[in-house]
Amino acid sequence: YFSEYAPHQTAISHFEKSVDTLNENNKAIEKQIADTEKIIKEKAEPLEAKTLEDLKTAVKEAKTSIRKATKMESDTQKIEDQAKEIAKPVDYSETQKNITEKLTAYQNSVKQLAQITNPKDSFIEERLKEVDTIQEVQHATEEHDPNGLLNKQGGYTASIYFSDSQVTEPVYGTDIVDKGTEAGGCIEVYKTKDEAEKRNTYISAFDGGQLNPGSHYVYGTIVIRTSMHLTASQQKSLTEKIYNKLIELK
């Protein structure tokens, strides 16, 4: 009896010890997965949807990679074999690094979208000044607004005009706001993406006509407009420079 009972109990004890060790080794990655899933559940919208998909994939792969303890067999030798298998060293460092990287990318993307979602005029002005060809910057006020849309229903919450060195045609006006988009361009800020899209559609009605509005693109809840005096490639390049400055994380 003893010759069979003792080894069997020892095997069970080995098995349980191995399972405890494994559970201990799994704690860090399981906590990381739980914390990350909590962040995903908050449903914060990123600028690049792919960053969220990549993060979800990383979590899914991490879950699959976790070593699980198998159900204990009844045979003594099999239990010993199981214990050895479960106790083998486990290394999740690559998996954890992958989650960390994907989480950082997603959180940065969320911050980037926030920067172009109804930003303050001071933020826009600060970033515009960092674009190499932009010379002067001035925001519209309710008393001095060529379109008369500032803070009105469906109107913009900020409108920042700028002059650009690539515009060589003379543009008349007492100041940058007065000269309007023609001197370089303008950033119009809206509360919602819908309002920005509506404004963009309205501006599109004048494309190619007598009142050529220049280029206009929606990013987040803002419309980036550039002067009709610029060539198409200059408009595109200037728009990209401005956009990249606005989403740059500091």
Locate the predicted segments by residue.
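A short, solvent-exposed beta-edge/loop patch
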Residues: 178-179, 201-250
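Stable alpha-helical elements in mature extracytoplasmic
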Residues: 95, 120, 124-127, 195-202, ...
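Structured segments of extracytoplasmic/periplasmic soluble domains
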Residues: 25, 32-39, 58, 62-72, ...
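Short, solvent-exposed recognition patches
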Residues: 125-209
